[in-house]
């Protein structure tokens, strides 16, 4: 076994890399190594959730979010994204936040649309969260689900959400960036600017234990420590995207050309049966 929080040397390297890439000020004590992004999400939700809490996400979304949220006894509230570009409609977000809202889940690049949220959109979302925190006198957390962070095309930039909002928890996985989905390795990063972040980190540690994860795979923790900052060949995904997008749109299908990930979210030519 490794430490439940993850190998100390790996966590030091993670902190150093994230600080270098995103101008943060994290240490090893902000990182908790996990069994992939699904574990990162379930642990984070378990650490934050209390009875009657609500978490907001944005359609289209990874369907397991509902399972992960409801596992904690909380409710998932789904807000539709703007149909024309799948960016977030902040008016709808503001209307959806209530006194029961514990946090929101943002996934960028998005599964299944491949859309990357723009910096302008993120700033607007964070402004709404700040406003609602003051209105309700409570913390509202931003859970950043980022397994596709490196899978972007044409020099698209993915804003690092921790730099835009203090109460942020980042959930990351190496499944996509290193093409290692079956090896189950990732991490949680708790912002050092979050209110009572050490208590949040302690809750993350407790949630990981309560959910029975024990520790991330020890061998792959050693491997990841030597691969930080590397990716598999992203150009293959970009080539496939271009071929499929061109073919589908030539046949008359409508879809937004994805900025990242490896999905095309295609609108059917037929009307919805519902």
Predicted regions and their residues:
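PLP-dependent class I/II
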Residues: 2-5, 9-12, 16-274
């Amino acid at each position: 076994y490794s430490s439940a929080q993850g190998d100390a040397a790996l966590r030091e390297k993670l902190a150093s890399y994230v600080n270098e890439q995103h101008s943060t000020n994290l240490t090893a004590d902000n990182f908790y190594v996990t069994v992939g992004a699904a574990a990162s999400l379930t642990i984070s939700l378990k650490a934050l959730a209390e009875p009657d809490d609500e978490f907001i996400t944005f359609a289209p979304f990874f369907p397991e979010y509902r399972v992960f949220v409801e596992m904690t006894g909380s409710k998932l509230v789904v807000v539709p994204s703007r149909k024309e570009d799948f960016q977030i409609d902040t008016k709808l977000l503001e209307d959806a936040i209530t006194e029961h809202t514990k946090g929101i889940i943002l996934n960028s690049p998005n599964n299944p649309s491949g859309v990357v949220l723009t910096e302008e959109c993120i700033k607007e979302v964070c402004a709404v969260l700040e406003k609602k925190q003051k209105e309700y006198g409570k913390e509202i957390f931003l859970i950043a689900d980022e397994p596709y962070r490196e899978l972007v095309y044409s020099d698209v930039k993915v804003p690092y959400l921790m730099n835009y909002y203090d109460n942020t928890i980042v959930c990351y996985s190496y499944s996509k960036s290193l093409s290692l989905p079956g090896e189950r390795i990732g991490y949680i990063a708790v912002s050092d600017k979050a209110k009572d972040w050490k208590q949040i980190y302690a809750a993350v540690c407790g949630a990981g234990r309560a959910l029975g994860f024990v520790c991330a795979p020890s061998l792959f923790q050693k491997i990841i420590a030597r691969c930080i900052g590397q990716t598999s060949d992203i150009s293959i995904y970009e080539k496939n995207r271009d071929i499929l997008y061109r073919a589908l749109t030539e046949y008359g299908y409508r879809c937004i050309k994805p900025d990242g990930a490896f999905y095309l979210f295609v609108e059917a030519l037929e009307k919805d049966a519902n």
